[in-house]
């Protein structure tokens, strides 16, 4: 189950008389390798940095090339959903007080310290061409970063062996209309939250047939048979871009044959069908291991 990630920047300045103007509209950025790794171990969206280099972004970078200023002042947070385009998003606006970011700026980044970058980009003009913008000494600079998560549109498949018997597994994104509510809002918070911080849960279902798993906009339509405990597997391994979860169902209350399982995680809501049903009674503990993966979206 792999979630694709993307980000965009927007720049606006406010003059002393209160009037505002957009000086660089929405443009894509490069999520760095350091940023992809940071998702597996900690928060990543607490600081914004601006600087003066025109060097092209590359995945191995970890900081701005020529940093001038940084801000951890968060003006606004919002989350949203674009069902037709298959993503949900966080928008966080960082404010640089008048004079803090004054000068000629050509690069920008967001990250989790005053220097370490989750992403880096060159500032571009309205045509998308790298440019230099000028912020005057009496102007306030607001930089908005939009972080997107795209849910997978293709099913995964696997074979599960339990007590010598084989079961066919189909995995799929679930209830994508709630992704921005159940996970993205948690990411926003103080900005310090990460995949390690939230452990939402796991549910088992019984009855029905694999087709009852349903499409990506709904939860499984089988009968619910109880909730379990979701915990993390091994510690994050650098450059793996994945975390493992283990769903546990103790002897009670889940005592029915299991035909589907739903996982709710920071990286999305996912479900899987199990065919044939896995038998379970009040003497069994059932556990299932899954991996959530993430990747840089190709822009």
Which ranges hold each PLM region?
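Small cysteine-rich, disulfide-bonded extracellular modules of the LU/uPAR three-finger superfamily
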Residues: 1-105, 112-299
